[in-house]
């Protein structure tokens, strides 16, 4: 079958989970099953829980992994719920690749790309909120908020004002072309960060990621490796801060002179002191991997 996707940091992910010989690994964002197929080929003693909220991605991954049918459970849903759903299973690994999939980027009708003829950007196509609603109905103040907080757009007020005074916009292409004409040029396309902000708002991406971490903490997993691939600083900051929190033995307030908590609260240890990034060769072969970062934590 034609495989339309190159998984990011593929070898690094396989290396991360190579010593797991039993139990389940949850692939929170299965997509085209690039990582999942690699993990199953590497070690057929493990079983996988393949989760995705995209119907098309799940259908493809079921086809791709059919030879492993006895070792795979498929689940449709947002990854914020997957740990709670499978809390009674022996979970030994959790993988989340939280970027937009190639499936979503390359399909013009999904509205993620600059050439898309819709203004959608929903990862779950069953939800009601889409990019058109955000762009064409949000107040200028609301747009300023998302461009500042989710896109870190330097001229967030200008972008919001331009959109409000020139809407409605009917497609991502129309919006991208408009911003390209109106905004100053730099290393990035002028629509890159505004599109990121709109996409995060539509899919509540940062909230979903935080709720995944909260569910991992609540589950009290034992002897479990958690590997997260992020693609921008907002996501990476969340991953880094949770891992740092989980690795701390002392949870006393900073103003306490002497530890009073027992100094025994660490849930595990950070495996990657610095994030793993793609090699120059991988970036050349797959330019979309350029901004990816892999961080790994191990629950004791």
Curated annotation (Swiss-Prot):
Keywords: Cytoplasm, Methyltransferase, rRNA processing, S-adenosyl-L-methionine, Transferase. It is an enzyme of class 2 (transferase). It catalyses: cytidine(1402) in 16S rRNA + S-adenosyl-L-methionine = N(4)-methylcytidine(1402) in 16S rRNA + S-adenosyl-L-homocysteine + H(+). Disulfide bonds: none annotated. S-adenosyl-L-methionine binds at residues 33-35, 52, 86, 97, 104. It comes from the Bacteria. Its main location: cytoplasm. Its EC number is 2.1.1.199. GO terms for biological process: rRNA base methylation. GO terms for molecular function: rRNA (cytosine-N4-)-methyltransferase activity. Specifically methylates the N4 position of cytidine in position 1402 (C1402) of 16S rRNA. PANTHER family: 12S RRNA N4-METHYLCYTIDINE METHYLTRANSFERASE (PTHR11265:SF0), S-ADENOSYL-METHYLTRANSFERASE MRAW (PTHR11265). This is Ribosomal RNA small subunit methyltransferase H.
